[in-house]
């Protein structure tokens, strides 16, 4: 199921992500290097198998739904210049 030599926390991250999805998130989110919530549709489908995608194997910065909502409120929305 899980290759623990990749990241021993990968299964735990997947379990936590499943909880966050049940609590209202539509996608799994990780904190990116710019400090923004980054959705990962690949992880969203893989967490139900106890895995994360290859890009996020070593990323333990899983965001809860509360943090995602807070970051969305803090990030100013871009307005088009049309």
UniProtKB/Swiss-Prot annotation:
Pfam families: Acc5b_avian_CoV. The keyword Iron does not apply. InterPro entries: Acc_prot_5b_avian_CoV. GO terms for biological process: symbiont-mediated suppression of host gene expression; symbiont-mediated suppression of host innate immune response. The keyword Metal-binding does not apply. Keywords: Eukaryotic host gene expression shutoff by virus, Host gene expression shutoff by virus, Host-virus interaction, Inhibition of host innate immune response by virus, Interferon antiviral system evasion, Viral immunoevasion. Involved in host translation shutoff without degradating host RNA. By suppressing host gene expression, facilitates the evasion from host type I interferon immune response. This is Host translation inhibitor 5b.
């Amino acid at each position: 199921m899980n290759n623990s030599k990749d990241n021993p926390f990968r299964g735990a991250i997947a379990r936590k992500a499943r909880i966050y999805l049940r609590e209202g998130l539509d996608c799994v989110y990780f904190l990116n290097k710019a400090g923004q919530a980054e959705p990962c549709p690949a992880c969203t489908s893989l967490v139900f198998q106890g895995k994360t995608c290859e890009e996020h194997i070593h990323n333990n910065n899983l965001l809860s739904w509360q943090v995602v909502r807070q970051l969305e409120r803090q990030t100013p929305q871009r307005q088009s210049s049309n």
